[in-house]
């Protein structure tokens, strides 16, 4: 089997077996601790520009099917696994992981010590990495890697170029696409919403002209400070419409209300993150995928209150506006992959939109 190298910007490197596309690629190396859900993870637009390391030792054992995509065209730069299953077994399986990666033009590497790599990332933080042929000159690879600046304005690359509708007979929801997962749209469809998906740079005036019952801010990749267009829009609609944000949408909501965000050392990516609801003490296990978080101290003096925290590191995981019907979560209530413990948040959004009809808004 052809050999491949994963070179990190600190000079560490790993040599393993090449899987997927043969092309060379550079990205931010991160790790995901989920035991299952690799198809949903690889196709999640929030992983734009990243090389994903799966910590679970066997990946691809149930293959890839046509139903579990979170986007049609994956935005990941590469995949790192300990072992890629060659002979998957599942009644829904259609192609192997290797075949899928080749089809989508995603390079990968297998047969390396992913535990060692994960511990390195935990110690040093996320690092730039390059996947290349094992025969490449290591000094030249390292020099090239260190000279490359990872892309910003990532949301622009994964957001819908034009608005489109997903019809339903119920509430009318505008879903602002910062890199939305298909599962979020499906959750709204399950509740019979008429969903209009709009590009990330849609203005408040354009949204209000659609006369929706509520607005949802989607997940997405990158630094929330790279999306200044969103902040003015959020300020223009909060108080006028019920608002619900997820992941990047949560961070943008915080910035729009005067709080700050920061980059986590190695992020939260997995399906087993415990989150506590402060009002009730309830603890749920959640699916998470974020490299940035809201700075807790920056919330002092704002109109936002913390509703949820992550129990491992006390990261802010939920916010609510003190006056307006608006709340956000850092985790993923739609799951996919991960537990569906917090799926009820979509129902709370529906109830909030019902409150709009009953005249409960403050605007």
UniProtKB/Swiss-Prot annotation:
Glutamine amidotransferase type-1 domain residues: 172-359
Keyword annotations of the record: Amino-acid biosynthesis, Arginine biosynthesis, ATP-binding, Glutamine amidotransferase, Ligase, Nucleotide-binding, Pyrimidine biosynthesis
Catalytic reaction annotation: hydrogencarbonate + L-glutamine + 2 ATP + H2O = carbamoyl phosphate + L-glutamate + 2 ADP + phosphate + 2 H(+)
Binding-site residues for L-glutamine, renumbered to this chain: 46, 220, 222, 248, 251, 289, 291-292
Pfam families: CPSase_sm_chain, GATase
Swiss-Prot/TrEMBL GO biological process terms: 'de novo' pyrimidine nucleobase biosynthetic process; 'de novo' UMP biosynthetic process; glutamine metabolic process; L-arginine biosynthetic process
Pathway linked to the protein: Amino-acid biosynthesis; L-arginine biosynthesis; carbamoyl phosphate from bicarbonate: step 1/1; Pyrimidine metabolism; UMP biosynthesis via de novo pathway; (S)-dihydroorotate from bicarbonate: step 1/3
Entry similarity comment: Belongs to the CarA family.
Record's function text: Small subunit of the glutamine-dependent carbamoyl phosphate synthetase (CPSase). CPSase catalyzes the formation of carbamoyl phosphate from the ammonia moiety of glutamine, carbonate, and phosphate donated by ATP, constituting the first step of 2 biosynthetic pathways, one leading to arginine and/or urea and the other to pyrimidine nucleotides. The small subunit (glutamine amidotransferase) binds and cleaves glutamine to supply the large subunit with the substrate ammonia.
Subunit structure comment from the entry: Composed of two chains; the small (or glutamine) chain promotes the hydrolysis of glutamine to ammonia, which is used by the large (or ammonia) chain to synthesize carbamoyl phosphate. Tetramer of heterodimers (alpha,beta)4.
Protein name: Carbamoyl phosphate synthase small chain
Provenance organism: Listeria monocytogenes serotype 4b (strain F2365)
């Amino acid at each position: 089997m052809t050999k491949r190298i994963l070179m990190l910007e600190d000079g560490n490197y790993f040599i393993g077996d090449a899987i997927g596309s043969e092309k060379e690629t550079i990205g931010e190396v991160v790790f995901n601790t989920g035991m299952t859900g690799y198809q949903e993870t690889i196709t999640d637009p929030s992983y734009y520009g990243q090389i994903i390391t799966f910590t679970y030792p066997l990946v691809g054992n149930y293959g890839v099917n046509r139903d579990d995509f979170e986007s049609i065209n994956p935005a990941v730069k590469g995949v790192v696994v300990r072992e890629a299953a060659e002979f998957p077994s599942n009644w829904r399986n259609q192609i192997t992981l290797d075949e899928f990666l080749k089809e989508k033009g995603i390079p990968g590497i297998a047969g390396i010590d992913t535990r060692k790599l994960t511990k390195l990332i935990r110690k040093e933080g996320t690092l730039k990495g390059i996947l290349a042929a094992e025969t490449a000159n290591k000094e030249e690879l390292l020099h090239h890697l260190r000279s490359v600046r990872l892309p910003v304005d990532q949301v622009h690359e994964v957001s819908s170029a034009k608005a489109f509708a997903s019809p339903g007979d119920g509430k009318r929801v505008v879903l602002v696409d910062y890199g939305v997962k298909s599962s979020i749209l499906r959750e709204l469809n399950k509740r019979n919403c008429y969903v209009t998906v709009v590009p990330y740079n849609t203005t408040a005036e354009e949204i209000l002209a659609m006369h929706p019952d509520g607005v949802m801010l989607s997940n997405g990749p990158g630094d929330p400070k790279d999306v200044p267009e969103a902040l003015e829009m959020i300020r223009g609609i909060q108080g006028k419409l019920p608002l619900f944000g997820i992941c990047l949408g949560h961070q943008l909501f915080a910035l729009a209300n005067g709080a700050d965000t920061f980059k986590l050392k190695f992020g939260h990516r997995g399906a087993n993150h415990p989150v506590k609801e402060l009002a009730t003490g309830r603890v749920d296990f959640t699916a998470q995928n974020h490299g940035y978080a809201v700075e807790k101290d920056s919330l002092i003096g704002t109109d936002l209150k913390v509703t949820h925290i992550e129990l491992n590191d006390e990261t802010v995981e939920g916010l609510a506006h003190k006056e307006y019907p608006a709340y956000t979560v850092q985790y993923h209530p739609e799951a996919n992959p991960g537990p569906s413990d917090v799926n009820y948040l979509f129902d709370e959004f529906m109830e909030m939109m019902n409150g709009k009809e009953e005249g409960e808004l403050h605007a």
